[in-house]
Amino acid sequence: MSHPLVPQIIKFATPIAKSLGLELVGAVFHTNQHPPILRLDIRHPHQDTGLDDCERMSNAIGEQLDAANIIPEPYLLEISSPGISKFLDNDRDFIAFKGFNVAVNTSEPYKGKNYWIGQLVSRDQTAVYINQKGRQASIPRSLINTVELQEGR
């Protein structure tokens, strides 16, 4: 489930990215972290997105976002790229990478574990489902910090 501030953040960040010749392709606000983490995913439409693109976006938006006071409490800003990050965030990612190996990291232990590895089966409103050696595991979305694509299929 997306944080209620994400649409406002996207509306604010999109023109800034565009002014730098970049595209904003996603935003996630992880409020279960302390301090919360705002991650903006960008891409360069005409070449590979590099660290310099992420740095330019970070420099351009950081102070403006603070001045706009969209997020009233302290937070960390992360700028990344789908080419740099292997994290699955949106429905499109979870559909595209069905059957791929993923690592799921939870904010607190679930069934005694904070780290789950398996093949991605699906995601719905309540959970992410992975296959672990023929057994399906259901991990509540409310506990998930990250779902990261792993090497190999």
Swiss-Prot record:
Its main location: cytoplasm. Keywords: Cytoplasm, Ribosome biogenesis. The keyword Cytoplasm applies. One of its GO terms (biological process) is ribosomal small subunit assembly. InterPro entries: Ribosome_maturation_RimP, RimP_C, RimP_C_sf, RimP_N, RimP_N_sf. It comes from the Bacteria. It is found in: Cytoplasm. The keyword Membrane does not apply. GO terms for cellular component: cytosol. Required for maturation of 30S ribosomal subunits. This is Ribosome maturation factor RimP.
